[in-house]
């Protein structure tokens, strides 16, 4: 009897060690060549809470050339009381599968609307190999051609079309209608959807941006996850992100939370392999990696999904590629801190603090979503509205980007306001300058439940013949929305270097002059460095004030992307000679002076032109 007790104790210890080895140490890997139909094993995934639970797996065969050339996936049937209730569910991606104690790979693919839980398994070798190869330092990027028409698009558009084009992806958000392959839905194997939880963001806001989100492969789920704090990183231990546990890829954290839920396939020391298919296929990344717990898995006839809540920050996701995502415990993610203060139309102030991933495509989009949510939480979206926006975008080693604008609309101005912040971010992040390091975004928005605008009707000037250096007075007449007329007095000094002859004086709002600038040679340029790009963005005119521009017909030039309106004939001849090429664009109309007027009581919209004559 004593020997039997000892034997059973040893067996229990060995069994415990065997199970622990799958989660805390490196299990032996099973090559794809050894996988045969009929083989049975088990998988691990979290169905509730944070503890991974077992389900059974039976190999049915392999598909060659799927999902990519020279690759194959294992087709298997999943069974067990938990899987039988939910089927293959969104968020299950990455669940490890073991046969004879060896790691085969990750549950990653499924057939939509299948009656049984039939899944595709990404072989673990593919997941490891793709992240072992090409782990090189990021190569310096060259500056891109930046257009002022892109910058000023914010004043005329409320759609994502005004921002740099988002890449289209069907990963995790494949449509079941309106697609050329719609008749074959259910007959094709697709990546298991990755549920992305939106916390603090109303459903109507998620709906407003659903098209943009689905284009890049995000399946939004609103208001079902728990928020995450801006707490510091928690040191990892042997129980952190073990195989089968739930992992969260955080895109926004703080008062707003946007995070994607998946499952850890393999942990090798501090290296984490998960998902088994791409999340957004973004390549090199630097996103927060957090622990995650599951509220429940919701059975759904279309696509079951898990409700998750992000937990402690434990590292960073550094790769998002064809066979999964890869992260490193202890690595610090690169985030952009945001402070957003909304002064409501009812004299209250709401402050939001959060962080957004630093990414050329995601940062502008997520900024729009979070800002729109903050405004929509307290302000109306139908009816006359004026939003006054101020703030800064802080860049390490550069001058701040100044935000100072107003937007008014009879049907809500929020989308115009959020674009005014997202647009400079998009241009900066897509400029190609490696030196760019966004240190923070600080924005104040003041809301008024009425329109505060007027239309510029006419100009008056006290004299039409002037001398160089002489002071004159102009008056700009504008009419506001209720029909009342008011006058803006504008003192003006004629430039001392004005040529004899006619001068054109233009008075207009920032948006009108920005649109006029689109036709000028200076509207498109390739900045030499980040500092020049920052100066160009800060030169953009604002909607909430008038500008006075004095112009003349004549000869000037743009030299090395800087406008030089007055150049002597000898210099123009040298620049235009056959011995000189590049960096030179002639100008037929030159701006002699330009003045920004202080903000007025109303937003004045429109543009008027008057001509004077300079005499001796």
Predicted feature locations:
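Positively charged n-region of N-terminal signal peptides that target proteins for export
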Residues: 1-5
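Bacterial N-terminal signal peptides
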Residues: 7-16
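Terminal presequence/propeptide segments associated with secretion/organelle targeting
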Residues: 19-616
């Amino acid at each position: 009897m004593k020997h039997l007790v000892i034997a059973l104790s040893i067996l229990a210890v060995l069994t415990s060690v065997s199970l622990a080895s799958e989660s805390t140490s490196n299990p032996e890997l099973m090559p794809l060549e050894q996988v045969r139909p009929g083989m049975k094993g088990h998988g691990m995934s979290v169905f509730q809470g944070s503890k991974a639970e077992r389900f059974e797996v039976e190999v049915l065969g392999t598909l060659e050339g799927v999902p990519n050339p020279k690759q194959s996936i294992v087709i298997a049937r999943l069974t067990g009381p938990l899987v039988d209730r939910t089927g293959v569910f969104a968020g299950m991606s990455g669940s490890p599968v073991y046969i004879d104690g060896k790691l085969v790979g990750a549950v990653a693919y499924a057939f939509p609307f299948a009656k049984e839980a039939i899944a595709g398994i990404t072989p673990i070798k593919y997941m490891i190999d793709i992240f072992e190869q090409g782990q090189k330092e990021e190569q310096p990027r060259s500056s891109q051609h930046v257009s002022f028409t892109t910058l000023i698009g914010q004043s005329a558009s409320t759609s994502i079309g005004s921002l740099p084009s988002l890449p289209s992806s069907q990963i995790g958000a494949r449509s079941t209608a309106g697609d050329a392959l719609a008749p074959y839905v259910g007959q094709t194997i697709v990546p298991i959807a990755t549920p992305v939880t939106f916390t603090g963001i109303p459903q109507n806001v998620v709906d407003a941006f659903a098209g943009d989100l689905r284009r890049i492969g995000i399946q939004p789920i609103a208001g079902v996850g728990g928020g995450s704090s801006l707490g510091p990183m928690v040191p990892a231990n042997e129980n952190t992100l073990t195989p089968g546990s739930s992992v969260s890829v955080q895109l926004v954290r703080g008062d707003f939370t946007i995070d994607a839920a998946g499952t850890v396939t393999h942990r090798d020391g501090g290296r984490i392999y998960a998902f088994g298919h791409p999340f957004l296929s973004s390549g090199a990344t630097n996103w927060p990696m957090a622990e995650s717990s599951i509220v429940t898995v919701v059975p759904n006839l279309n696509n079951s999904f898990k409700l998750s809540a992000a937990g402690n920050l434990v590292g960073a996701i550094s790769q998002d590629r064809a066979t999964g995502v890869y992260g490193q415990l202890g690595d610090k993610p690169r985030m952009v801190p945001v402070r957003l203060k909304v002064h409501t139309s009812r004299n209250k102030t709401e402050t939001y603090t959060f962080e957004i991933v630093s990414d050329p495509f995601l940062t502008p989009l997520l900024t729009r979503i979070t800002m729109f949510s903050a405004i929509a939480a307290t302000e109306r979206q139908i009816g006359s509205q004026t939003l006054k926006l101020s703030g800064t975008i802080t860049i390490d080693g550069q001058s701040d980007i100044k935000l100072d604008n107003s937007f008014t609309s009879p049907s809500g101005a929020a989308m115009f306001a959020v674009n005014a912040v997202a647009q400079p971010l998009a241009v900066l992040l897509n400029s190609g300058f490696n030196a760019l390091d966004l240190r923070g975004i600080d924005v104040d928005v003041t809301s008024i439940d009425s329109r505060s605008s007027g239309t510029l009707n006419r100009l008056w000037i006290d004299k039409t013949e002037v001398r160089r250096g002489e002071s004159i007075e102009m008056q700009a007449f504008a009419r506001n929305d209720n029909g009342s007329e008011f006058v803006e007095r504008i003192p003006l000094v004629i430039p001392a270097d004005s040529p004899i002859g006619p001068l054109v004086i233009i008075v207009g709002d920032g948006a009108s002059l920005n649109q006029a600038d689109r036709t000028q040679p200076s509207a498109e340029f390739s900045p030499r460095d980040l500092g020049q790009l920052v100066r160009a963005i800060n030169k953009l005119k604002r909607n909430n004030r008038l500008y006075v521009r004095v112009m003349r017909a004549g000869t000037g030039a743009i030299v090395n992307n800087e406008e030089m309106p007055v150049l002597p004939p000898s210099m123009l001849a040298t620049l235009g000679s056959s011995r000189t090429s590049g960096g030179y664009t002639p100008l037929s109309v030159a701006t002699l002076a330009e003045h920004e007027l202080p903000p007025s009581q109303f937003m004045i919209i429109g543009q008027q032109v008057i001509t004077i004559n300079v005499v001796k």
